[in-house]
Amino acid sequence: MSPVLEWDKAEERIFELGVDRGVFYPYDQQTGEYLEGVVWNGLVNVTEKGAGGEDNKQYADNIVYANIRSEAEFEASIEAFTYPDEMSECDGTSQPEVGVFIGQQLRKPFGFSYRTKIGNNNDNLDFGYKVHMVWGATPEPTEKSRDTINDSPEASTFTWDLATEKVPVTGRKPTAHMWVDSTKVAPAELEALEDLLYGSDSESASFPTPDEVLALFTTP
């Protein structure tokens, strides 16, 4: 006899929240490789947005003859109190002399990783987390508001809307966004990924390709 469905078991009341462990990976457009990662402090929000994937119905013989779906794209936005110095060039800012900045310059792509928490009713926020990786991100122009200081001062935040360029994945369609769920993978495999992304005693932080990430978790 099949078991009766049961809702809201304590260990199954799962939810997600938070964002931390931001890392920025500069991209060398000449070599096509990502450079050593640097910490991105002050993350307030990362919003993941889907784009594309829309129906394009083709009609013939008075019926829908074919339904061609456009390519899905990944877009995102980042809000933060601050950002790494290396981000300036990606945001269209040049520094011709130390401390002197020029806007409206060419924008450069970068890689980005961040972590979101997974909680449940038993372990609260210690249940697990997801490590997200974004390739080929390029910021689009956004507003920067400068407000007067008043009797309820608040620190300003910076925001960036990101377009992405997908990268190859063997056996799958190209992607710009990938994530790993700590509750579903072996701890040793997760540690190997984090050693790459965050650095270790012997290696600097680096940004792997999707295939290199998959190789860490491939079942023998």
Predicted regions: what is each one?
Residues 2-85, 134-155:
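Solvent-exposed edge beta-strands and adjacent loop segments
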Residues 24-26, 33, 113, 178, ...:
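Intrinsically disordered, low-complexity N-terminal regions enriched in serine/proline/glycine
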Residues 35, 90-91, 160:
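Broad hydrophobic/π-residue packing in well-ordered secondary structure
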Residues 64-140:
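Structured, beta-strand-rich domain cores
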Residues 141-220:
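Mixed-charge, glycine-accented linear interaction segment located at domain edges/termini
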